[in-house]
Amino acid sequence: METRALSVNLREVKKNGAAKLRRLGQVPAVVYHKGEATVAISVEEISLNKLVHSSESHMIDLQYPDGKSVRSFIKDVQFDPVTDRVIHADFQLFSTDEVVEMEVPIHLEGECPGVKIGGGKIQINVHTLPLKGKPEAMPEHFTIDVSALELGQTLHIRDLQAIAPEGVQILGDADTSVVSVVAPRKEAETAAEGATAEA
């Protein structure tokens, strides 16, 4: 997994401080690690957006003004419900020998027969997968081959563990639907109407 650098500044936690930072183009955030005190920081909104909206996951070197640098990853992000702007972020520190949990984006590859021959369309039900493993084993994205997926078929989390990178476990409910091939809406509605008429 690629590592990206992100400049950060320490911040004081005080009344209305977060709102003031946002007006200045900064996003309030925290840095934490098990057994250590949580550190309040701020990051440039533009730089953070590039990481948050990337199609890949990254390890992040948080770089402080005094030259200190620590390795982390984005654990959580909060968005404004109206503007969809990032309003807060959590960064989790890690060491290379510890197991971490993080969300990784899904990438699809292959020509889907359920689409090409069956006339269906691919429906992505979740866009990220929660993974658990050591940092060096974590992929930038999780690739799913859909070249054997027929119309009406669905891949669940339980189907994907076999293709996970060595040493990486997929978390979550095994029955969670990840990607499906569904009939176009008109066909689905016609089929439903036909079934109703027969009934």
UniProtKB/Swiss-Prot annotation:
Pfam families: Ribosomal_L25p, Ribosomal_TL5_C. The keyword Ribonucleoprotein applies. This is Large ribosomal subunit protein bL25. HAMAP family: Ribosomal_bL25_CTC. SUPFAM superfamilies: Ribosomal protein L25-like (SSF50715). GO terms for cellular component: cytosolic large ribosomal subunit. It comes from the Bacteria. PANTHER family: RIBOSOMAL PROTEIN L25/GLN-TRNA SYNTHETASE, ANTI-CODON-BINDING DOMAIN-CONTAINING PROTEIN, RIBOSOMAL PROTEIN L25_GLN-TRNA SYNTHETASE, ANTI-CODON-BINDING DOMAIN-CONTAINING PROTEIN. This is one of the proteins that binds to the 5S RNA in the ribosome where it forms part of the central protuberance. It comes from Chlorobaculum tepidum (strain ATCC 49652 / DSM 12025 / NBRC 103806 / TLS) (Chlorobium tepidum). InterPro entries: Rbsml_bL25/Gln-tRNA_synth_N, Ribosomal_bL25/Gln-tRNA_synth, Ribosomal_bL25_b-dom, Ribosomal_bL25_C, Ribosomal_bL25_long, Ribosomal_L25_dom, Ribosomal_uL5_bac-type. Disulfide bonds: none annotated. CDD domains: Ribosomal_L25_TL5_CTC. Belongs to the bacterial ribosomal protein bL25 family. CTC subfamily.
